[in-house]
Amino acid sequence: MLTRITLPSPAKLNLFLHIVGRRPDGYHELQTLFQFLDYGDELTFTLTPEQPGIRLAEPVPGVPDSDNLVIRAAKALAATTENTLPGVTIHIHKRLPMGGGLGGGSSNAATTLLAMNRLWELNLCEDQLAEIGLRLGADVPVFVRGHAAFGEGVGEKLTPTNPPEDWFVVLKPECNISTGKIFSAEGLTRDTPKIKIRPAFEGDASRYRNDCEDVVRKLYPEVNQSLEWLSQFGPARLTGTGACIFGRFPTESAARIIWESKPSGITGFVAKGVNHSPLHKKLTELK
């Protein structure tokens, strides 16, 4: 029986994000293109039969354990069985910024669902895990599925796609963005015409955009300044509601040249876009 497992929890980018309408329940209808990065957090799960319960090895600063998506994911999974389950201690090695639009919390939740499904030998299928994930957050299912995808609805209706696996410079301006503030903004575009799946990743990338970007640029000058700087070298875009932005480059060396010249005070990283999640690659190796 497997008692310990260490797994990656990759970042995602929204290569574009269009808001195509608003539902009666107030949620926005989206069309977006998700792609993973070969960069992210790392989670270690250790079963503790002698110590029941679900716990973090160390608290995440600023996030109560009861609100942490890792704890919530493990508890949601445990609720699917009446069997007595061994306890687990979870160590989170964070590299992704919180609230950056990179899906860090959602990715952590998905990694937890897949890891604990295996450690607890629950044998739930991917569809069941994605359904649990959706209750935790709209971005969790794409991490559970593990393939780049065209997302619709609130982002949960997924069609696998294979956009080019380019290199990215990802920058994190020094500000924290409220997603609720962006989606409730008066000037937010909410009527972008729907596109079909095939054109979602073909042709000129500048034809597509992030509908949140104009509002974010107006409300957060730090993001605007970073986008202006990165746009000197090619199309630059917001991911999610930010604050992270990204620029696409054909090679690692081209990306690193730009990275080395970034303004002081801005954090971030260089990473490769990948269509098959590093999490799922690792799980396949462990079979």
Swiss-Prot record:
Residues that bind ATP: P97, M98, G99, G100, G101, L102, G103, G104, G105, S106, S107
Active site per UniProt: K12, D139
Keywords assigned: ATP-binding, Isoprene biosynthesis, Kinase, Nucleotide-binding, Transferase
GO molecular function, one term: ATP binding
Principal EC category: transferase
E.C. no: 2.7.1.148
Gene3D superfamilies cross-referenced by the UniProt entry: 3.30.230.10, GHMP kinase, C-terminal domain
Single biological process term from Gene Ontology: terpenoid biosynthetic process
Metabolic or biological pathway, per its Swiss-Prot or TrEMBL entry: Isoprenoid biosynthesis; isopentenyl diphosphate biosynthesis via DXP pathway; isopentenyl diphosphate from 1-deoxy-D-xylulose 5-phosphate: step 3/6
Catalytic activity: 4-CDP-2-C-methyl-D-erythritol + ATP = 4-CDP-2-C-methyl-D-erythritol 2-phosphate + ADP + H(+)
The keyword ATP-binding is assigned to this record: yes
Family named by the database record: Belongs to the GHMP kinase family. IspE subfamily.
UniProt function note: Catalyzes the phosphorylation of the position 2 hydroxy group of 4-diphosphocytidyl-2C-methyl-D-erythritol.
Protein name: 4-diphosphocytidyl-2-C-methyl-D-erythritol kinase
Protein species of origin: Marinobacter nauticus (strain ATCC 700491 / DSM 11845 / VT8) (Marinobacter aquaeolei)
